[in-house]
Regions:
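Catalytic core of pol beta-like nucleotidyltransferases
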Residues: 1-6, 13-178
Length: 178
């Protein structure tokens, strides 16, 4: 599943319960911290961008290759395989979300901030669900849904949604002189 657009996912494994007994709070904290870190930094390994994830010890995820940088060894060594990827379906799925992001941008421009915020949350949830369904399918990381997610991430649509969310919220909360 590598291409010139690929990135390297660096998973930092933490025992959330050793940080705080409220593991949902710990997860929310680490999710926010990693999103901020990923937004601010552009670290690469051989020109592939590194994306940080923080996961709870024992958390399961599917991957064709897992390498421990701590132990300098493969945990799951990737096997090169010929995989048929449905790029046409992935492009269609991603284009639908590109179109939705543009409509949301128009809502923000038109001052319809509350409506924009509701749409943003729904679209982000649908994107998460789409990827989850894809990763849990037989095709897993090669599914059209996961490839569509990667297209959206590569094309900065996920960032655009987050930026629109901040813009809509800030505009909604701003008090203007009359």
């Amino acid at each position: 599943n590598w291409s010139k657009y690929s990135d390297i996912d660096l998973h930092i494994v933490v025992d959330f319960s050793s940080v705080n007994e409220n593991t949902e709070l710990v997860k929310a904290f680490f999710d926010e911290a990693r999103l901020r870190w990923n937004d601010k930094h552009r670290i690469t390994i051989h020109e592939f961008e590194v994306e940080i994830y923080v996961e709870n010890i024992g958390e399961k995820h599917k991957s064709s290759g897992i390498y421990s940088i701590t132990n300098d060894e493969w945990i799951i060594k990737p096997d090169p395989i010929e995989q048929v990827i449905d790029f046409e379906t992935a492009e269609k799925k991603s284009q639908d979300y590109v179109d939705r992001a543009q409509r949301i941008s128009n809502l923000v421009s038109d001052g319809k901030y509350e409506l924009a915020l509701r749409h943003i949350e729904r679209v982000k949830e649908k994107i998460r669900d789409m990827r989850k369904v894809g990763l849990e399918s037989e095709e897993a990381e090669f599914s059209a849904e996961n490839i569509a997610f990667k297209i959206l991430r590569r094309d900065q649509i996920l960032k655009k949604l987050n930026d629109l969310k901040a813009d809509a919220y800030d505009s909604m909360m701003t008090i203007k002189d009359e």
